[in-house]
Each structure stands twice: as structure tokens, then as C-alpha cells.
Amino acid sequence: MSGKARLHYPVTRQSEQLDHYFGQAVADPYRWLEDDRSPETEAWVKAQNRVTQDYLAQIPFRDAIKGKLATSWNYAKEGAPFREGRYHYFFKNDGLQNQNVLCGQLAGKPAEVFLDPNLLSPDGTTALDQLSFSRDGKTLAYSLSLAGSDWREIHLMDVESKQPLETPLRDVKFSGISWLGNEGFFYSSYDKPDGSELSARTDQHKLYFHRLGTAQEEDRLVFGAIPAQRHRYVGATVTEDDRYLLISAADSTSGNRLYVKDLTREGAPLLTVQGDLAADVSLVDNKGSRLYLLTNRDAPNRRLVTVEADNPGPEQWRDLIPERQQVLTVHSGGGYLFAEYMVDATARVEQFDHDGKRVREVGLPGLGSVSGFNGKQDDPALYFGFENYAQPPTLYKFEPNSGAISLYRASAAPFKPEDYVSEQRFYRSKDGTRVPLIISYRKGLKLDGSNPTILYGYGGFDVSLTPSFSVSVANWLDLGGVYAVANLRGGGEYGQAWHLAGTRMNKQNVFDDFIAAAEYLKAEGYTRTDRLAIRGGSNGGLLVGAVMTQRPDLMRVACQAVGVLDMLRYHTFTAGAGWAYDYGTSADSEAMFDYLKGYSPLHSVRAGVSYPSTLVTTADHDDRVVPAHSFKFAATLQADDAGPHPQLIRIETNAGHGAGTPVAKLIEQSADIYAFTLFEMGYRQLPRQP
């Protein structure tokens, strides 16, 4: 039994707001919660948090879970080194530092701290986002996120003195930092929106060049000045030899235009590499005037093509690494190209030279995910990380000329891979589609149908859920839990066709895949209904919301984080319009409106239905998926749910969509989610003492 009988939800005012779509009236009684800075909304947030925290405080093992998380998180972590100027840099964390620290090291000397974001805010909510060095390595440009917002400030630092240079650049969002020599860099910015920066829509991205020693007001507008250059996302890349500028322009999360300009020729025109939005194309490398491009144009699983920069149109592209059955990603460094193939959501890596000759397959330690294989063209060694759900990240050194691999740094995580099982299974979805599912648990676990199980999914935006280690998940396994990750349609695990099969009017496939995964886990003896929780964040929060409203009988607990839950209005907030490629919008057509309304979690809550125990989590500074989605959904659940289970919302303050969240907040969030999950499954003591 849960404790809903003891819950008294805050009163949430209902308005008479009605919207009309193609002659249909749709009520939106909690529209006022979209004003995230109004005193009424702020009071509502405080009241909801009080109810949630009071409920969580009664759980007898909540503190034990938090203590175990803090203990197991407290180990030294160090990232792969990279070379800039005279220094080798790396990120490190002593254990429980809220943000990773940038360190630099000269040959033969001890490492020193270059940039410590933990000193920038007392609560650790100022996070380092991107960093980029001038070609000579003497100047560092880095962007900071404040309280989790997508808006950034770009700061400049003199490397030798570690002193700041200039006034920070403001109003930066969804931007890279791409240097041109040592004189300045390209970055992207939106005009300051009308209304709240945290909820107002941002549409036109512009590319600027900032020259060192000048004010931001003097920055040169490079792209975005004319109507033909109006795009929602604009970014720049300068080739390592400073010869070419490439500009990518897109209106959604799939498909982009690409342009190239020869920076060595004064007055050189901006040439079109790809002039439509029919496919994705991006620069991997260049060798002289030859560009190396990764694209899914005429290749759903992607291919690597080459083209001369002075005649770069698609009709001139030539395959260097042709499309295969597996999805391709390409990295460059050390004078070589590295083709990473995804085989049933796990990585294989092959090395090629710039003429397309296959040099070797890189021997990986096992089945899992890799990161790295990036560097400068003259780097004598590259580094890569390897991990899976049972294996903490381990760093390896790779010598591209010989192919030699050596252990660079083993993980200090207090977990032994041999204590866990991580197995891949395949199941059939509603329409017969074969879907992969990776299931992890501690060795010795009895598959008798009684295990507390979390099923996690995402299923969107061409994002692939590859095996990765998480201290939080490892703790769940140590508590006696099962953790299952479904590689749903809508993701990128099997290329463009897999992605498109979970978009727009195919979105129901994603929900059906997830429902089938839950049924598989129960049929195979991993768990049962009252021991099953479903979980997802962002687009995965939409997934959880849709599945719990379509099949409230399927699971006992639903935990959704920063979810997209109002499918009729998502495109009117901040970056939401950029997701239309995956979702479609309620303004597209009557058929699209009907389809969206049919699964929109906010509009699918039905009065008189008993819903599972639900914990909605969001953050007050989330300007990617604005918290109004979660606010309105939680208010609707609290008003309409007829069952005995709690419908709670946990609202993090001074936090955003997730990236850069301080370690202290991550520990608290994980502890609350696990405590709630186990308590609502009926546990009054931990299923396994860690």
C-alpha cells in the first residue's frame, strides 16, 4: 500500500482557457502554470515540493540509499588527455566535486588546475559547457551554463597567467566555439527573446565572429542577415589548417544545409555543399582542398564521402567509406580516420587512411561503447574510453601507426564487473519488429518474477542508447534491482529507417515497443507488474507519460524526468519548434492534430482511472523542455486520478534539463527516485543490503 490517503495536494486553480484546433475546442485549465516566474506559479512550486518532500521523508531507507550513493560516487575520476599549445589537458574530479576540474600539465612537471567551475558558484550550479583553444594554445575560450539554463556566457582566459580577458559574451545558446587562428572565433547567438528567456520561443540563430580585444557589439555578423539565411540552428567549423569555414544551418533536429568558404582567398564566395534539408551532412576532416563528409544522403546508415572544396555539391561526392548494414560514425586524429560501426547498439571500430584504405580493426576490450579516437592530425597517440553497463569507463592509449593498445587508466570505481551480468535479448513488438533489450543485474539473482525492475527508454531524435556505466544504476543493481534498457524505434541504433519508424504518425510504434519490452520482462521471469517501474527523461519522459496513460495496468511505478507532455503546445516554447521533424505539430494538419492529441500525455489523463504511483521530476531553469509540461501534467493527474497511488512532482531549483547538474543534486535525485520506486513497490526495507 502506498500512502496516498495521507496526501493533501495543493489546490491548483483551474481557468476557463479554451484553444481551438480545426474546429475542435481543447481545454487548457492550467495554462497559467506556463508563466514560470509569476508569484502564483512560484507559490505552487513551493507547495508541491513540500508535499513531495514530506512524502519522501517517511520512507525508512531513503537516507541509506543516499548514503550508499554518496559513498560509491566518491572516487577519483580522470578523463583522456588532449594537447593544446605547450600543455596536455585533462578533466578530473576528486570524487564528490559538483563539477569536473580542468587541469593542465607541461612535460616533466606536475599538473596544475586551470579552471575550477566549483569556485564559480557556492551551490555548484555553474557548469563548464564547452572550451576551445586558439591555434597557438595561448588563449582559452570557454562557455558557462548558469543554473542549468541553455543560455551561455563565453569567457576568455590567458593561458599563461590564467587571468580573464575581456567582458564575457552574452546571449549565447546552442553554440560551438570555433577559432580562426589566434585572432578570434565564430559563435552562434539568438536575439534576446521577448518575455522570459526560460520559456519564450527562440527561432532565428545567427553566426558571429568575435575578434579578440573588441566588444561584443562590434562582432561581425557572418550568417543570418538575409531571409534566405533564417534558420533555427546555425553552427560553424573551421578546419584544423584554418583554410576553410564550414557553416551548417538547420530548422529541426534532422537535415541541414552546409556551406563552405575558402578563408585563404579574400572575397571568396560561400559555396553550397548541400542546399536542401533532405539529409544530414557534416565535416569530419580535410586534407588540403579535399573535404571528408559524413552523410546519410542516399545512405540511411551513413557513408563517408570526399569532395573538392571548390566544387562541393552532392553530384560531386565520391564514396570513401560506403554505406554498410551498420550505422556509421567517423572520427579523425593521428593522420587517420576511424569508422565506428554500431552493431546491435554496441561498437566496432575500423581504422582507415585518407585514401580509404582499411588499415585494421581496432581490438576493443569487449561489447560496449567507445568514446574518443579524436585528435590533431599530428598526434602520435590517441585515447579512447570503453564502458558498458557493468564495466566502469576505462581509458586506453592507441598508437595509430602501429595499432598498439595499452591501458592508460583503469577506473577507480568501487564496482567489480565480474559481480554483474549484462545480457542482450531481443523481443518482438506489437507489429512483429525485432527490438533489442539489454538487461543488467547482479550475479546470483533469481529470475523468479519477484525482482524490482526499472525499464528505461528514449526512442527519438536518432539518439542511440548504447551501453554506458552509471554509478546510480550500479547502485540499483546492488540493491537487488534489475535495470533494462530498450533500444526503441525512433532512436538511431539501426539508422535512418529505424529513426523514421518512430517519428510523427509512426510515434505509436515507440510506445508499442516499450510496452512489449515490459511484457517480455514479465514473461521471462525478471519481474511482475507490481515490481515494475518505467523511467525516461525528456523525449523519454514523453514515452513514460504516453505508456502510463495508455496502459496504467502495465506497471506499478512511473518516473518521468523533464518530459515533453503537452504535445499540442510544445512547439510554442523555447527550442520546441525544432522538434517538429520528429513529432509534427498541432498546426500542421487536422490529421496531425488528431494524432498528437491522441497520445499527448497531458490530454490522455482520464478522470476515474487508477494510475500507477508517479513521480514527475523537472527543474525550474529547464529552458529546453520547459517545466510547464510537468507542472500541467502533475496538476491534471492529481485532479483526475481515482486510484490509491501518489501522484507527486519533484521540482529541482537552480537546475536545468540535466547537463551540468551538480553531483550533490544528482545523488539526491537518484536517492529520491530509488526510494520512491521501492517504497511504492511495497518494500519497507531494502530488498538487498548493499
UniProtKB/Swiss-Prot annotation:
GO terms for molecular function: oligopeptidase activity; serine-type endopeptidase activity. It comes from the Bacteria. It catalyses: Hydrolysis of Pro-|-Xaa >> Ala-|-Xaa in oligopeptides. Keywords: Hydrolase, Protease, Serine protease. The keyword Secreted does not apply. The keyword Protease applies. Pfam families: Peptidase_S9, Peptidase_S9_N. One of its GO terms (cellular component) is cytosol. It is an enzyme of class 3 (hydrolase). GO terms for biological process: proteolysis. Its EC number is 3.4.21.26. The active site is at 538 (charge relay system), 657 (charge relay system). Cleaves peptide bonds on the C-terminal side of prolyl residues within peptides that are up to approximately 30 amino acids long. Has an absolute requirement for an X-Pro bond in the trans configuration immediately preceding the Pro-Y scissible bond. Belongs to the peptidase S9A family. This is Prolyl endopeptidase. It comes from Aeromonas hydrophila. The lineage of its organism: Bacteria, Pseudomonadati, Pseudomonadota, Gammaproteobacteria, Aeromonadales.
